[in-house]
């Protein structure tokens, strides 16, 4: 066949009058347009256009197709798409050519844009709709169901979503994939709920529904009625269904709010509360087992159902989860006490309370949830130094240490809790009420009434602790009566009590979006003159917007447009709470705009910080978004950039984030370094030097910063807190803003946001305790007991091992003080030494060479030993129940126990219900290590976690209680 060098002959046929010749010309041009498009475009494009628009011409669609291909080769995609739509069926979506594939992507993008447009008058071209539907048909024919599902989700086509899942042939896999995509990619809350509704219906239509996934969808939909119905039906069936019901209960407690759990329990049949004769129990789990595990289930009958129902209620209340976590954290506590003692020693060398408070906070975080207060009891004299608000922080730290010890909370704090009226120790009493809130955070049914009672005592300092405690205990309950009680405290117009009341009102109404609360809080924020109160109300308003997404936009616009920078500050957190984890572009755009344009440093700092919340589900994107802001001339922006990285990349050990943070640790401004240290610890929490080499380096940097006399005090405070964060919960807890199933971790999000307010008020540091999640897998049998079982971790133990303990310093304290030498003595020694200098030079040189040789030999020996140890290290290890498993270790876990298998297909961190494969054999249970709770005397050093009577209180100390220092007189500052 002769090669064609030109299409001029075909183009000339377009001038003929006969339609057949014109049609023939277009057919030939269509076959070679990709090669001769430039010649066609330069001479005959207008002629082809006239044929395209002439509907009387039989080949007008072919003319449009030729034009589309010409414009495609000219890279004029809008015109190419326009004429492709006019080509009708000639634009064959089944074709695999580059032209078809490219325009299909363009058409799909345009279709998605039109489908998601907020303009109600938007009309979609029927030809465009036809092409996209053809694309869906092509996907179904080729078996590309996931591709069709992805396009359907982006285009918001619910009918195609349902069709893609139901026709896929692997419905369960597609349902899981759709749920994941829905949580990660769908920004519109209303549409996401519509998709979740379809998933629930498709799940329930299966022969064997996956009730675990169904309940996850129902939690997102806030449908407690359907959840209760499923639970009730499951506990009436066989043992397999019972285990599934218990597992669903544990997942509900982990992923839903207090109010949702209460609603579910109210829909279940009630159970009679049994009186407990035993009062000196251990954690909540022990008392629970005494009540409900007194015997095996009876076969059939109402007693068996009642026992199952009682256990289900205990799971939903949280007694089992909290008790098991307490047991795990207590028995596995691996806190390095040398670090704490070193910090305490260093704090004694510094004036002021900042380092002293930092050590208290670090100790609380290191022992969070472990119930171990050994460090406090062994340093009583040091604790006696605390006065006023430092004493408040010291007592409230017990709440972090004993987090979750709900059964014995009042006994633990009995020494400090207030009576019917205020005595001479309001700071201790207020701190104890705050501690109660920290112990009962998001689980405060038993303590709320007590805190309300103390809220009625007329004392501003007591109101502060009681308000914070009540807000934490009643978090997200949405109770109007508690809101009104706190509002009455707010209206006292006192800065101390108002600061706590504003935050507490937001915590109680967390995520409710209540219009009444918004109007009242915003109005009072504009009326009051107290900056503390305005700021706390702004944060409270942000709490109300938790998870509201687009519904929060009206309030957000109102807050960020306010003249008061304190309200704009709260507006940044309103964006963070409304869009946490969504990666929403509009939210990020607003935050970035404020970060570079607002005239107030605190607002800019908050805006940059809140980027971390929005990107918390996509940590890999945060370093890129923050990189330039971390180099800003404004130190407040750099501070915010550091915390944004810490929040978004918490527990990931991400190297890009660590590189930016490492550069910020050498910043010239103390508080920027403070943020960098803390954020570095957040990123490196639960990582080992084998997995992330920077983990070991970071610990050394923290220690160096603390011991360096020239280091800024704010930087040192950050390094102290960093040690507390990186070793949190006895090195058995991590920071997770989202659960593996995609749910937001409400406690963690609120905890970190509250913790960040330590910039203004140090006691808010304790909120970090809320953000900590135990990293454990705890297996339970049908009686909610821990059986002895093991599973395999298919990786080297060192990858996820505890960091080695630091060695105590052997340097004596006298070495720190140099002997004073007079100048004339130094001169005499210098003159006498010069004569012997030449002789000594050779000796010194020889000694130096010998020293270097020894150091080299020692280094080689260490390397050989390390290599030898690495060779001997096993490739896997067996883990025993309850086991420490960090999030990144889950992928290596294999459940291969001969007797017990998890009811879940892919168990996550937390409590796992176990199926007993040999139920007729006797079970061996794990022996509890937690000692009985008893009140200890001052001199008792038994090591029990409840010997709090030995902690400092104003009624037992020898130092007098000093009055609170008065406010300085007004003055004018002139440079």
UniProtKB/Swiss-Prot annotation:
InterPro entries, sorted: 26S_Psome_Rpn2, ARM-like, ARM-type_fold, Proteasome/cyclosome_rpt, PSMD1_RPN2_N, RPN2_C
Q: Which UniProt keywords apply?
A: Proteasome, Repeat
Q: Which GO terms describe its cellular component?
A: autophagosome; lysosome; nucleus; proteasome regulatory particle, base subcomplex; proteasome storage granule
Q: Could you give a single Gene Ontology term from the biological process aspect?
A: proteasome-mediated ubiquitin-dependent protein catabolic process
Extract the ranges annotated as region (Disordered): 272-303, 832-882, 922-975
Ranges of compositional bias, category Low complexity: 944-961
Any one Pfam family here would be RPN2_C
Molecular function terms in GO for this entry? Answer: endopeptidase activity; enzyme regulator activity
Placement of PC repeats on the sequence: 393-426, 431-464, 465-499, 500-534, 536-569, 570-605, 606-638, 640-674, 675-715, 718-748
Q: Where is the composition biased (Basic and acidic residues)?
A: 842-880, 926-935
| Gene3D superfamilies on file | Leucine-rich Repeat Variant
Record family assignment: Belongs to the proteasome subunit S1 family.
What function is annotated for this protein? Acts as a regulatory subunit of the 26 proteasome which is involved in the ATP-dependent degradation of ubiquitinated proteins.
Name under which the protein is recorded? 26S proteasome non-ATPase regulatory subunit 1
The upper taxonomy is: Eukaryota, Amoebozoa, Evosea, Eumycetozoa, Dictyostelia
Gene coding for it: psmD1
């Amino acid at each position: 066949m002769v090669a064609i060098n030109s299409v001029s002959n075909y183009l000339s046929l377009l001038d003929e009058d006969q339609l057949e010749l014109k049609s023939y010309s277009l057919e030939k041009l269509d076959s070679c347009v990709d090669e001769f498009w430039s010649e066609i475009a330069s001479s005959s494009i207008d002629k082809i256009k006239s044929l395209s628009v002439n509907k009387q011409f039989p080949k007008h669609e072919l003319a449009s197709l030729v034009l589309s291909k010409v414009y495609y080769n000219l890279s004029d995609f809008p015109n190419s798409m326009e004429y492709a739509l006019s080509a009708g069926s000639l634009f064959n979506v089944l074709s695999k050519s580059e032209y078809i594939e490219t325009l299909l992507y363009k058409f799909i993008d345009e279709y998605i844009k039109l489908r998601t447009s907020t303009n109600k008058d938007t009309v979609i071209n029927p030809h465009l709709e036809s092409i996209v539907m053809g694309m869906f048909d092509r996907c179904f024919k080729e078996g590309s169901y996931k591709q069709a599902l992805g396009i359907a989700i982006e285009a918001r086509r619910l009918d195609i979503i349902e069709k893609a899942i139901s026709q896929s042939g692997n419905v369960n896999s597609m349902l899981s994939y759709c749920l994941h995509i829905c949580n990660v990619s769908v920004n519109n809350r209303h549409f996401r709920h519509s998709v979740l509704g379809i998933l629930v219906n498709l799940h329930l239509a299966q022969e064997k529904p996956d009730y675990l996934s169904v309940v996850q969808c129902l939690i997102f939909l806030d449908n407690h009625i359907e959840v209760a119905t499923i639970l009730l039906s499951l506990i009436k069936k066989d043992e397999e269904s019972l285990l599934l019901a218990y597992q669903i209960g544990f997942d509900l407690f982990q992923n839903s709010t207090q109010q949702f759990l209460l609603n579910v329990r109210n829909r279940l049949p009630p159970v009679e509360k049994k009186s407990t004769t035993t009062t000196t129990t251990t954690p909540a789990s022990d008392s629970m087992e005494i009540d409900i595990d007194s015997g095996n289930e009876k076969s059939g009958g109402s007693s068996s159902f009642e026992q199952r129902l009682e256990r289900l209620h205990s799971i939903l209340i949280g007694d089992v989860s909290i008790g098991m976590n307490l047991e795990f954290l207590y028995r596995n506590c691996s806190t390095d006490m040398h670090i704490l003692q070193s910090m305490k020693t260093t704090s004694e060398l510094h004036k002021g309370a900042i380092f002293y408070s930092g050590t208290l906070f670090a100790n609380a975080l290191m022992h969070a949830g472990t119930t171990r207060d050994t460090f406090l009891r062994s340093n009583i004299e040091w604790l006696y130094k605390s006065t006023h608000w430092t004493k408040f922080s010291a007592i409230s730290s017990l709440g972090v240490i004993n987090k979750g010890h709900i059964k014995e909370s009042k006994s633990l704090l009995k020494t400090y809790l207030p009576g019917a009226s205020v005595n001479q120790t309001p700071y201790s009493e207020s701190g104890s009420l705050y501690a109660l809130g920290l112990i009962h955070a998001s689980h405060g049914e038993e303590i709320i009434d007590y805190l309300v009672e103390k809220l009625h005592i007329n004392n501003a300092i007591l109101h502060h602790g009681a308000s914070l405690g009540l807000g934490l205990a009643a978090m997200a309950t949405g109770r109007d009566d508690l809101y009104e009680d706190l509002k009455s405290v707010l209206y006292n117009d006192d800065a101390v009590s108002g600061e706590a009341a504003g935050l507490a009102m937001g915590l109680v109404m967390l995520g409710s979006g209540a219009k009444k609360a918004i109007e009242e809080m915003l109005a009072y924020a504009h009326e009051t003159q107290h900056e503390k109160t305005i700021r706390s109300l702004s944060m409270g308003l942000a709490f109300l917007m938790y998870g509201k997404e687009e519904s929060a936009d009206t309030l957000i616009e109102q807050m960020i447009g306010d003249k008061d920078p304190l309200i704009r500050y709260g507006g940044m957190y309103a964006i963070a709470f409304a869009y946490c984890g969504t990666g929403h572009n509009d939210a990020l755009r607003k935050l970035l705009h404020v970060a570079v344009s607002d005239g107030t440093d605190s607002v800019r700092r908050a805006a940059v910080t809140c980027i971390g919340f929005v990107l918390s589900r996509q940590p890999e994107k945060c370093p890129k978004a923050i990189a330039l802001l971390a180099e800003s001339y404004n130190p407040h922006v750099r501070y915010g950039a550091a915390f944004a990285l810490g929040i978004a990349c918490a527990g990931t050990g991400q190297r890009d984030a660590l590189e930016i943070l490492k550069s910020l640790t050498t910043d010239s401004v103390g508080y920027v370094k403070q943020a960098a240290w803390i954020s570095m610890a957040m990123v490196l929490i639960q990582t080992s030097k084998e997995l992330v080499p920077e983990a070991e380096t970071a610990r050394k940097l923290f220690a160096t910063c603390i011991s360096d006399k020239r280091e800024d005090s704010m930087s040192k405070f950050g390094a102290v807190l960093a040690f507390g964060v990186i070793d949190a919960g006895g090195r058995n807890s991590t920071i997770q803003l989202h659960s593996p199933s995609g749910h937001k971790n409400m406690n963690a999000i609120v905890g970190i946001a509250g913790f960040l307010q330590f910039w203004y008020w140090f006691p808010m540091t304790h909120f970090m305790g809320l953000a900590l999640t135990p990293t454990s897998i705890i297996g339970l049998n049908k009686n909610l007991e821990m059986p002895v079982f093991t599973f395999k971790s298919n990786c080297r133990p060192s990858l996820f091992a505890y960091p080695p303990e630091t060695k105590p310093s052997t340097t004596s304290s006298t070495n720190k003080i140099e002997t004073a030498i007079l100048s004339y003595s130094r001169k005499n020694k210098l003159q006498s030494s010069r004569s012997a200098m030449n002789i000594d030079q050779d000796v010194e040189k020889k000694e130096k060479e010998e020293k270097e040789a020894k150091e080299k030999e020692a280094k080689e020996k260490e390397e050989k030993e390390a290599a030898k140890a690495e060779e001997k290290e096993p490739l896997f290890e067996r883990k025993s129940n309850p086991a420490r498993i960090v999030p990144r270790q889950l992928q290596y876990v294999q459940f291969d126990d001969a007797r017990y298998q998890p009811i879940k297909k892919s168990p996550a961190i937390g409590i796992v219900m176990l199926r007993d494969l040999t139920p007729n054999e006797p079970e061996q249970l794990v022996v509890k290590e937690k000692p009985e709770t008893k009140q200890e005397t001052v001199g008792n050093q038994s090591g029990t976690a409840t010997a709090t009577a030995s902690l400092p209180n104003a009624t037992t100390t020898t130092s007098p209680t000093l009055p609170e220092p008065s406010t300085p007189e007004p003055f004018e500052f002139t440079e």
